[in-house]
From Swiss-Prot:
Quaternary structure and interacting proteins, as annotated: Interacts with H3K4me3 and to a lesser extent with H3K4me2. Component of the NuA4 histone acetyltransferase complex.
A Pfam family this chain is assigned to: ING
Stored CDD domains: ING_ING3_Yng2p, PHD_ING
Biased composition, class Basic and acidic residues, residue ranges: 193-207
Cellular component annotations (GO), alphabetically ordered: cytosol; NuA4 histone acetyltransferase complex; nucleosome; nucleus; piccolo histone acetyltransferase complex
Region of interest called Disordered, as start-end residue ranges on this chain: 138-218
Chain positions of site Histone H3K4me3 binding: 227, 238, 242, 250
Gene expressing this chain: YNG2
Record-given protein name: Chromatin modification-related protein YNG2
One GO molecular-function entry: zinc ion binding
Keywords tagged on the record: Cell cycle, Chromatin regulator, Coiled coil, DNA damage, DNA repair, Meiosis, Metal-binding, Nucleus, Zinc, Zinc-finger
Organism: Debaryomyces hansenii (strain ATCC 36239 / CBS 767 / BCRC 21394 / JCM 1990 / NBRC 0083 / IGC 2968) (Yeast)
Xref: PANTHER family: CHROMATIN MODIFICATION-RELATED PROTEIN YNG2, INHIBITOR OF GROWTH PROTEIN
Amino acid sequence: MDTTTVLDKYTQDLSNLPLEVKHLLQELKNKDVQLQEARKRYQTKDNQIHKFIRANGTLTKHPKEQQIYNKVEEDMVLVKKLQKEKILLANTALFLVSKHLSNFETDIAKLEKDELLPPVDNVMELDTPSSDMNSVINGLSDNLSGTTTPRGHSASTPVADNAANSMLRKAQKRKHALGMKGASGLTRPSKRMKSEDFEDKKYDNDSLSRPNEGPGNNGEDADNNLYCFCQRVSFGEMIGCDNDDCKFEWFHWSCVGITAPPKDDEIWYCPDCAPKMEKRKKKRK
C-alpha cells in the first residue's frame, strides 16, 4: 500500500458520503418540522384552557378539558419521541464522518510506520499553500479529465505521489491538531461519571483548537483524549458502553440522548453497538 493507493481508496470511499449525510440531515429537518407542529398544537390547546379559566374562573370546568389534556399529552409524548429520533439521526451522521476519518488516520499511521509517509513532526513547512494546491491539481487533473499519463512499469507517477503525500500530510496535521485519541488505559469502574471524576480536570471549550502533544509529552495530569461520537474531550456527565470492543468507549449524555443515569446493574450499549449486540444475541438463541 502506497500513498497514491490510499488517496484513491478514500476518494472512492467518500464519494457517497455527502449524499448519505445530506439524506440524514434532510430526515432530521423533517423530524424537526413535525416536532414544531406538535409543539404548536399542544401549546394552542393549553392556551385554550387558560383562556377559559381567565374568563370563567377556576371553579368552572371546561366542557372538553379532559379531551384537550389527552391531546396535549399525546403531542408531548410525540415531541419527546421525535427529539430522540433527531439525536439518533445527528449521531448517525457524525458517526459516518468519524468512521471514515478514523480509518483514514489508521492508514496514515501504517504509512508512517512503513516509512512511506514522513511523520508530521518531521515534515518541513517549506511548501507554500499555492504549491500544495498545484501539486494536488496536477496529480488529479488527469483522472478528472478522463486522460491518463504513461507510467510504464511504475506503480505511480512522481506527480501523483506528490499530490497524495501533500493531501496525506494535511490530514496528518489535522489529526494532530485535533489530538488523536490514543490508548487511554481507562478501566470502567462505573458506567456513569462526571468529567471531574473522569479525569479530575476541567477543560475549556477551546481545547479542540489547541494542538495535542504526542504521548509522553502531555504530563500525567493532562488528558486531551477525544471521546464519544462528537470526538471531544470529557465534560459533564459521561457514560461507558458495555461493549468491550466499542470504538468510542465513553459518551457524553447529551450526545446519546440520556437524561438520567442507568441503574448499576443495567446494561447499556451506544447507538452504534446496540444493533450489533442485538444481532449477536439473536444468533446465540
